Amino acid sequence: MKLILITTITTIAAVMLVGCATTQPPSPPTAKAPEISIHKAAYQGNIEAVKRHIAAGTDVNTQDDSGWTPLHWAASKVHNKTAKLLIEEGADVNVVNKDGLAPLDYAENQIFGVLIDNGAKSGAELKAEGK
């Protein structure tokens, strides 16, 4: 009888210890964002810095004080590879800035097709749709 009681108490204690264990908070992203902002990196076509921002969890749709996203900057400076990377990582091709203009409105010929192929519309088209 003593053996059963000791076994039962030991089992209950073990269950309580396991059930009361604290869980570890999720670990932060292992990559660290570079010193340069994602907007400036996109403006400069610094694809490596953009990749590091993405790895660190930076939002590719973040807007600066003028409402420009990194894609606005990449499109305006004809940085095709940077624009493609941003789009592949979820950049919204139809975000409008404070002037009501989308990345497509700033695009040059070389990048125009990339944006159109990914559903981009001009600021005027988006305004007509009520966006």
Residue ranges and their predicted role:
Residues 21-23:
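Bacterial signal peptide processing site
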